[in-house]
A protein has these predicted regions:
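Extracytoplasmic/periplasmic, Sec-exported soluble proteins
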Residues: 42-46, 65-69, 105, 127-131, ...
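Sec-exported extracytoplasmic/periplasmic mature domains
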Residues: 55-60, 78, 82, 144, ...
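Extended ligand-binding regions for polar small-molecule ligands
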Residues: 1-15, 48-57, 117-136, 140-141, ...
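Inter-domain helical "communication" segments and dimerization helices
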Residues: 6-8, 98, 118-119, 141-145, ...
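Acidic, polar ligand-binding/catalytic clefts
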Residues: 48, 52, 56, 61-123, ...
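Alpha-helical transmembrane signal-anchor helices
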Residues: 246-284
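A "functional boundary" signal
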Residues: 122-125, 142-144, 159-167, 186
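Extracytoplasmic small-molecule ligand-binding "clamshell" domains
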Residues: 3-96, 142, 149-153, 158-161, ...
Length: 284
C-alpha cells in the first residue's frame, strides 16, 4: 500500500487518515543541529530540515512549541507536554529515563574536546559541561576523562565562552556544534581534538505515550531520505554566516584594527584641535 514515497501497512494508513498534529520542541540554542527562529516562530537546523522531509514523505503535520533551553525541552518530553523532541541522544537507557521512544538515528557525530590555546593556571582541569545532556553523563561516567572539577552551563556555547574566558580549561561537544562555533572569529583561540573512542548519534525522541504507529511511520519517512539529501541539509546548516561588524573585524585582525582605530582617533583629534585653534583665533 503506497502513500507518498513510503510503503505503509493498512494499520498505519488508518492512523494517518486521522492523525493529530504532532507537537514538537527543540533545544533553542544548539546550532547547527537544532535551534528556534524567533522571526518565524519555528525550529531551524539539521533536525528541522530532516523533519520537513519526513512530513513530505509521510503526510504527518508537525507544530513547534518553544522551549527556553534543552533542560526545558527535555522536561516537556518527560512530562508528556509535547509529542516529540527534535534531537535526543540515541541511547535506550537515556531514552527510558526521559520516558521517550527513539527513532532510527538521522545524524552520527564524533565527540571533541575543546581547549584554549592559551594555557590556564589551574592546578587541575576545570571542565565545562552542558546541563541535562546525555553527553555530559557519558563524560562523567568514563574514568578515562578527568572530571573532578566540573562547572555546568545551560548551553554548549556557554561552555565555549567559559573556556574562552579562562573560567574552565576544556569542554566537550559533538563535532557539528563544535565546528559551527569554532568557525566564529571570537573563538579563534580555541581548538578541538577528536576523541576516537566516543561517538554520539541523534534521533527524534517521541513521548512513550505516543501511538506506536507514529514511531513506525516516522522511521519509514527517515528511511526514504537519501544520503545525498542528508549531506545537502548538513552542508546548508553547518556554514556559519557571520554578520560583518567592527567587533568582528577587531576579533579577526586585532593588530591592524587597533592601528586603524588609533590612526582614525588621531586624525579626529587633530581635526578637533585644528577647529578649536581656528575658533580661538577668531575670537581674539
Amino acid at each position: 500500500i503506497r502513500n507518498y514515497r513510503c510503503e505503509f501497512t493498512r494499520d498505519e494508513l488508518d492512523y494517518l487518515a486521522t492523525a493529530p498534529e504532532i507537537t514538537v520542541t527543540c533545544d533553542p540554542s544548539n546550532a547547527p543541529i537544532e535551534g528556534y527562529n524567533e522571526n518565524t516562530q519555528t525550529a531551524s537546523g539539521i533536525a528541522a530540515d530532516v523533519l520537513d522531509l519526513v512530513s513530505q514523505y509521510t503526510g504527518l503535520h508537525f507544530r513547534y512549541i518553544k522551549s527556553d533551553s534543552f533542560s526545558d525541552a527535555l522536561s516537556k518530553l518527560r512530562s508528556h507536554e509535547i509529542n516529540m523532541l527534535t534531537a535526543l541522544a540515541h541511547d535506550y537507557s537515556w531514552a527510558e529515563q526521559n520516558h521517550a521512544l527513539l527513532t532510527t538515528p538521522y545524524l552520527n557525530s564524533s565527540i571533541v574536546v575543546v581547549r584554549n590555546s592559551k594555557p590556564q593556571s589551574h592546578e587541575r582541569d576545570i571542565v565545562a559541561l552542558p546541563n541535562s545532556f546525555n553527553l555530559t553523563n557519558s563524560i562523567l561516567d568514563n574514568p578515562e576523562y578527568d572530571t573532578e572539577d566540573v562547572v555546568y552551563y545551560d548551553t554548549i556555547e556557554e561552555c565555549f565562552q567559559a573556556v574562552l574566558s579562562g573560567s574552565a580549561d576544556c569542554t566537550y561537544a559533538d563535532n557539528y556544534s563544535a565546528n559551527y562555533l569554532l568557525s566564529q572569529v571570537k573563538y579563534r583561540n580555541l581548538s578541538s581534538t577528536t576523541l576516537t573512542a566516543m561517538t554520539e548519534a541523534a534521533s527524534f525522541g517521541l513521548s512513550d505515550q505516543c501511538d506506536p504507529r507514529l514511531l513506525s511511520i516516522i522511521n519509514k519517512g527517515l528511511a526514504c531520505i537519501s544520503s545525498e539529501q542528508l549531506d545537502s541539509i548538513v552542508l546548508q546548516n553547518c556554514s556559519y554566516r557571520e554578520d560583518p561588524s567592527l567587533l568582528t573585524l577587531v576579533y579577526a585582525y586585532p593588530r591592524i584594527s587597533i592601528a586603524i582605530i588609533l590612526a582614525v582617533s588621531m586624525t579626529l583629534l587633530s581635526l578637533l584641535l585644528g577647529i578649536l585653534l581656528i575658533h580661538s583665533r577668531k575670537t581674539k
